[in-house]
Amino acid sequence: MREEQVSDCGSITLEEWNGSSSTKLFKTATITASSSLSIQRSANRFNHVWRRVLQAFVPEGFPGSVTPDYVGFQLWDTLQGLSTYTKMMLSTQALLSAIGVGEKSATVIGATFQWFLRDFTGMLGGILFTFYQGSNLDSNAKMWRLVADLMNDIGMLMDLLSPLFPSAFIVVVCLGSLSRSFTGVASGATRAALTQHFALQDNAADISAKEGSQETMATMMGMSLGMLLARFTSGNPMAIWLSFLSLTVFHMYANYRAVRCLVLNSLNFERSSILLTHFIQTGQVLSPEQVSSMEGVLPLWATSLRSTNSKPLHKRVQLGVRVSSLPRLDMLQLLNGVGASSYKNAKYLLAHIKGNVSVILHKDSKPADVLKSYIHAIVLANLMEKSTSFYSEGEAWIDKHYDELLHKLRSGGWKTERLLSPSITWRANWISHTSAAKFD
């Protein structure tokens, strides 16, 4: 304790705090001024050091600067990353062995060419995957997150299998590289979407940087464990495969738990369908936490294996349909209906085709119109099984309840600015001032 003489101006106590926000502040010293100056510093140095270390791995203002689901997701994501880099050492060891590292007969140019083909295939695969699926990743981030890690596991499996097929080595490793290229695109894109979701204080860059630190730490720990595991299992194929398969099972389990922790408040096809179905039945809106526990996260091909009597409502709606692809009879009915006064200023049209609802969007439709068209289509799909006059009943329901639905969604914490959907490339334009109807 240190004391210095000061002028007598009453008693004043000043506390010194350290931290970047109120959620991380802690007291480091207490200064008392009366007839003398007294400075008492905090004795808890460990707490100070621990907070400094933590600042390298969690966003500034944590936990108040991120959503509540951040901690659970990052915990399971770190565990899956740890298992990934541990088993990566096993697959890399097998790959290097197949290329010929350590063999006298192996040539530098031969190994270089094989590595070139492997990387070239992966780069080409990444471009093709982005071309075909890049615009779909935002709308189903949970599913694509799982798919990304599944494809990574398949890629590592190909590397581990490569020594067993020396005559088809190039084909096997190229398939593995192709699989991992899908991982790079899907994982990076969904990570960007999730970072925006976690950011409560416009701190996406900080969250991304700290996530990079977490991943680097998991990488270093995983590679260290992987080196030990590779050393202990070297020359024992049974132990290698048992270790790899065990780590793969844990990896997928950790990924599943990670995406299950996510509570997204954006509207996509499935979440909108769940919300609307419940609203029609009860007049109430489910919370993001409730919907999160109800929505599916498995890939589409996995959910299609389940035996169901009827398709979910969101799978019976086709958004942004190309008009010329409709059956001629349905197209004629649609064109005749455009002349009705109710459609003159409409921003979308609905067509009922073989139990499904097709949505034709106007070329001037806005994000709010896209959301309304999809909600209207879900209402129509729900009414088709209950009434023969579903078109008129659907119109009446939208006119009466749509604004109420939006208000309750906003009050419940949902984002209603837009519908997260795959890219809509087909739109239409209709003119009904005479008997003419024009479509672009």
Curated annotation (Swiss-Prot):
Cysteine disulfide links: none
Alphabetical UniProt keywords: Membrane, Transmembrane, Transmembrane helix
Membrane topology: Multi-pass membrane protein
Keyword Transmembrane helix: yes
Compartments, record wording: Membrane
Major site of localization recorded for this protein: membrane
UniProt keyword Transmembrane helix present: yes
Stretches that traverse the bilayer: 109-129, 154-174, 232-252
Annotated GO CC locations: membrane
Stated family: Belongs to the RUS1 family.
Protein name: Protein root UVB sensitive 3
Species assigned in the record: Arabidopsis thaliana
Lineage of producing organism: Eukaryota, Viridiplantae, Streptophyta, Embryophyta, Tracheophyta
